[in-house]
UniProtKB/Swiss-Prot annotation:
Both CARD and transmembrane domains are essential for antiviral function. The CARD domain is responsible for interaction with RIGI and IFIH1/MDA5. It comes from Mus musculus (Mouse). This is Mitochondrial antiviral-signaling protein. There is a cross-link at K7, K10, K302 (Glycyl lysine isopeptide (Lys-Gly) (interchain with G-Cter in ubiquitin)). Adapter required for innate immune defense against viruses. Acts downstream of DHX33, RIGI and IFIH1/MDA5, which detect intracellular dsRNA produced during viral replication, to coordinate pathways leading to the activation of NF-kappa-B, IRF3 and IRF7, and to the subsequent induction of antiviral cytokines such as IFN-beta and RANTES (CCL5). Peroxisomal and mitochondrial MAVS act sequentially to create an antiviral cellular state. Residues 431-436 are annotated as: Interaction with TRAF6 2. Residues 145-166, 178-189, 371-387 have a biased composition (Polar residues). One of its GO terms (molecular function) is signaling adaptor activity.
Length: 503
């Protein structure tokens, strides 16, 4: 960082409140001096801590890049912040050495910048403007990459699809040299020609538009360095007609890329011929595999298998328009005998790329295959488990439910259930029946109102009641004896006085 850039950074840091109006997400696409990883981190910080705190990280990342002041001033003018741009320009020019030409800052004073940035334009060589200062159109500049990016595979793929010769690709520098990505891109157009129907073979140019080209905004390394997407290839795998009975002499040659494209026209004609043969062979119901089998040759783990390497698997080729994940078609499920080999049912899976072969093998259900081969009893594995549970064992809760109409009084100890084996046809519930019978004897005795709230058992309350009856009967006997004794004494005294008076 130069002296003028250091002083400019200190000015921005001391006057940070003036720059709070700068929107980080709006100005990021125009800061071409920042790398894509820096812009990704700033966007993540913007979502977490907001715009005001992210400005500190933005200025810290800017001051580590050479020539950041001129880029920042240009970005401020594009974002319609001319006041801040003039302040930064004045401070930056004041610390520059005398006599320094500011050729890069002269276009910034011209008011020919549009207010809004135009959308993404078509990627064409004629639209490129030579770099002479900052007089180019104010479109979003390409961010600085962390590492040296490889040559764009999108441009090479467009030229390969349009010319269909593919021997030489034009690089970004303008020189004509063999493309390093040509061999990796060659199987895709040939595969698209083989998977399409014969009448749609000439419409391969429409697939060029399916590859999006983003020419605006920063692109992270994980997005900008990815290979070509294979969406068009997977769409053709699902919508195209499965052509599996091709001759072995038309296998894909990986020795030279030019010969692979030279065979493209011949492969289309052979694919049309083989498609007509598969329509005639699909009428028959023979399950004898063809004696001529060609082993599958995998060229690379990232390249899809050519459908020509799966030549002549069986003579009963299903003419299904969309290859299903099931091993066999539902139309032929009833006609295939049980002795059909497993290779016949799993043959259509070879037309899928190798990276999807292992996944589809795991996702393939085994239910339809067993129905075709066995054709017998289709009882599931749960039938053996259900047969283990006998009738009395399943009806055990019914015995307990029948006693719910009676009042219940017991503790948690009385509810212990004896262990019983579910495999025994007649389980023994002796301890439970004895406990429940004791409950029935206790419940039949209607308890009194005084004993309902008592926690003690009924048997301990009965002797106490008998003692109370005996204790209550003792005073009445004593009073009766005392009264009879007094009455006898009174009668004796009266009798004695009557005799004395008579004498």
């Amino acid at each position: 960082m130069t002296f003028a850039e250091d002083k400019t950074y200190k000015y921005i840091r001391d006057n940070h409140s003036k720059f709070c109006c700068v929107d980080v997400l709006e100005i990021l696409p125009y800061l071409s001096c920042l790398t894509a990883s820096d812009q990704d981190r700033l966007r993540a910080s913007y979502r977490q801590i907001g715009n005001r705190d992210t400005l500190w990280g933005l200025f810290n990342n800017l001051q580590r890049r050479p020539g950041w002041v001129e880029v920042f001033i240009r970005a401020l003018q594009i974002c319609e912040l001319p006041g801040l741009a003039d302040q930064v320009t004045r401070v930056y020019q004041s610390y520059l050495p005398p006599g320094t030409s500011l050729r890069s800052l002269e276009p910034l004073q011209l008011p020919d910048f549009p207010a809004a940035v135009s959308g993404p334009s078509a990627f064409a060589p004629g639209h490129n403007i030579p770099d002479h200062g900052l007089r180019e159109t104010p479109s979003c500049p390409k961010p600085v990459q962390d590492t040296q990016p490889p040559e764009s595979p999108v441009e090479n793929s467009e030229q390969l699809l349009q010319t269909n010769s593919g021997a030489v690709a034009r690089m970004s520098g303008g020189s004509l040299i063999p493309s390093p990505n040509q061999q990796a891109l060659s199987p895709q157009p040939s595969r698209e020609h083989q998977e399409q129907e014969p009448e749609l073979g000439g419409a391969h140019a429409a697939n060029v538009a399916s590859v999006p080209i983003a020419t605006y905004g920063p692109v992270s390394p994980t997005v900008s360095f990815q290979p070509l997407p294979r969406t068009a290839l997977r769409t053709n795998l699902l919508s195209g007609v499965t052509v599996s009975a091709l001759s072995a002499d038309t296998s894909l040659s990986s020795s030279s890329t030019g010969s692979a494209f030279a065979k493209g026209a011949g492969d289309q004609a052979k694919a049309a011929t083989c498609f007509s043969t598969t329509l005639t062979n699909s009428v028959t119901t023979s399950s004898v595999p063809s004696p001529r089998l060609v082993p599958v040759k995998t060229m690379s783990s990232k390249l899809p298998l050519s459908s020509k390497s799966t030549a002549a698997m069986t003579s009963t080729v299903l003419t299904n328009t969309a290859p299903s994940k099931l091993p066999s078609n539902s139309v032929y499920a009833g006609t295939v005998p049980s002795r059909v080999p497993a290779s016949v049912a799993k043959a259509p899976a070879n037309t899928i790329p190798p990276e999807r072969n292992s996944k589809q093998a795991k996702e393939t259900p085994e239910g339809p295959a067993t129905k075709v081969t066995t054709g017998g009893n289709q009882t599931g594995p749960n039938s053996s488990i259900r047969s283990l549970h006998s009738g009395p064992e399943m009806s055990k809760p019914g015995v307990l439910v029948s006693q719910l109409d009676e009042p219940f009084s017991a503790c948690s100890v009385d509810l212990a259930i004896s262990p019983s084996s579910s495999l025994v046809s007649e389980p023994n519930h002796g301890p439970e029946e004895n406990e429940y019978s004791s409950f029935r004897i206790q419940v039949d005795e209607s308890p009194s109102a005084d004993l309902l709230g008592s926690p003690e058992p009924l048997a301990t309350q009965q002797p106490q009641e008998e003692e109370e009856h005996c204790a209550s009967s003792m005073p009445w006997a004593k009073w009766l004896g005392a009264t009879s004794a007094l009455l006898a004494v009174f009668l004796a005294v009266m009798l004695y006085r009557s005799r004395r008076l008579a004498q």
